[in-house]
C-alpha cells in the first residue's frame, strides 16, 4: 500500500491502429493503492481561456469529498494542499500536470484543498467525488496564500471566479479537518 494520501495515478493505455483504451477507475486497483472510497458524483468543467484558475476548494468534513481528477482536453496544473489541523505537513502542497495526452489522474482525499490552473485554452476536466455537492459545506482558501509555484508567465493574472477572489488566506483559515496520521509526501 502507498502511504501518501494524495496520489498520482498513471492508468495504463492499451493502443492499436484504432486508438487506445484505458480504465480510469477500478475498485480493486484503487484498493491495492490504499484508496477506499465510493464515488457518487461526476463533475465536468470547461475553461475557455488559458490561465484560468479554479480553487482552492473543499467541502467541510460533514460532507467532505475525496476526488479523482483528470483532464480530458488540454493541459492543467492540478494541486492539493494539506489543510488538516495538526498535520506535520499542514499548508504544504503537491502538484502535477494532467493532460488529455498523458492520461494522468490525481486522487485528492478529504482534508486537502484542491485547485487547478489551465495551461492552454479550451481545457476540460472531469472529477469523481465521494459525496454530492453541498453548498452549506462549500469552502476554500485563496489560491495565492500558500506559496504554490503556479506555472504561468511572470506578470500573468489568472482568470478567477468572484468567489475565488474573496476566499480567506491560509493564515486566516480555521481548519475543521483533523490529521489522520498520513503526512503529505512528494508525488511519485
What are these regions (language model features)?
Residues 1-102, 120-122, 129-188:
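Non-catalytic, conserved peripheral segments adjacent to functional cores
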Amino acid at each position: 500500500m502507498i502511504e501518501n494520501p494524495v496520489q498520482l495515478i498513471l492508468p495504463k493505455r492499451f493502443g492499436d491502429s484504432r486508438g487506445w483504451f484505458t480504465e480510469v477507475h477500478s475498485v480493486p486497483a484503487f484498493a491495492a493503492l490504499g484508496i477506499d472510497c465510493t464515488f457518487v458524483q461526476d463533475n465536468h468543467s470547461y475553461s475557455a481561456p488559458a490561465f484560468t484558475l479554479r480553487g482552492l476548494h473543499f467541502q467541510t468534513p460533514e460532507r467532505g469529498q475525496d476526488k479523482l481528477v483528470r483532464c480530458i482536453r488540454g493541459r492543467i496544473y492540478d494541486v492539493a494542499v494539506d489543510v488538516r489541523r495538526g498535520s506535520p505537513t499542514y499548508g504544504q502542497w503537491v502538484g502535477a500536470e494532467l493532460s488529455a495526452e498523458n492520461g494522468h489522474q490525481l486522487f485528492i482525499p478529504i482534508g486537502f484543498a484542491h485547485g487547478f490552473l489551465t495551461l492552454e485554452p479550451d481545457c476540460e476536466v472531469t472529477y469523481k467525488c465521494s459525496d454530492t455537492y453541498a453548498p452549506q459545506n462549500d469552502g476554500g482558501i485563496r489560491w495565492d496564500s500558500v506559496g504554490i509555484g503556479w506555472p504561468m508567465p511572470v506578470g500573468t493574472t489568472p482568470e478567477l471566479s468572484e468567489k475565488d477572489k474573496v476566499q480567506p488566506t491560509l493564515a486566516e483559515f480555521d481548519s475543521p479537518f483533523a490529521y489522520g496520521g498520513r503526512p503529505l509526501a512528494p508525488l511519485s
